[in-house]
Amino acid sequence: MKRIAIVVCCCLTTTACVDRLEPPLPPSHRQIEQVQDWAHKRSGPYDIPETALRAYAYAAWAVAKQKNCNLGWPTLAALGESLSNHGRAHDSRLDNDGTTTVPLRGLNLFDPAHPQEVADTDAGYFDGDPTKDIPIGPLQIMPSRWEQFNAAVETDAKPNPDNINDASLTLAGFLCSVGDPGTPDGWANGVQQINANPEFVKHVHAIAKKYSR
């Protein structure tokens, strides 16, 4: 991945109101050297694969620069943990370029007893299931959403839903499209688009808050 400088200039605000969860954002930094160096230093303490952490940080930086969208990497990291354990579900891992070694399909790790039923939109083209849509990749993006928002970090490459770099950039773009994730309502609305269960939203918020410290 191209080495870049990343600036994170957001702070974390908390509230006692359960129904109004403040967006978890990283603490202020004047300058976070470069994504790779930054991720290398924090991968161990956060227990996030360095490749995944780099992907989350780059995606947050990219949407901030290109879309003026105040997402923050902790939200992407919290979703990555909740949806696939950062690409490590089902004995998978991320290879050197960020692609999972096992195709991750329909994981539903948060509530496996109640999988989402979604009508088919892609005839199995992305998810391999011609009967219904199932979420794909390390960030469990629905096929219809992937088709609309897919983005590749490398501009000359085809976006790959099984690659955490492309998946992070795609999910970041989607979250920015449904509201301002730098506000409580915008943040909650974005996460609800992934899983409308209020407990899931609170779960993601708690993890993102942990990463924000």
Regions found by a protein language model. Give the residues of each.
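Polar low-complexity intrinsically disordered regions
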Residues: 1-2, 204
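Catalytic glycan-binding domains that act on GlcNAc-containing polysaccharides
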Residues: 43-213
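N-terminal export signals and maturation junctions of secreted/periplasmic proteins
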Residues: 3-64
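Short, intrinsically disordered, charge-biased short linear motifs at domain edges
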Residues: 2-3, 180
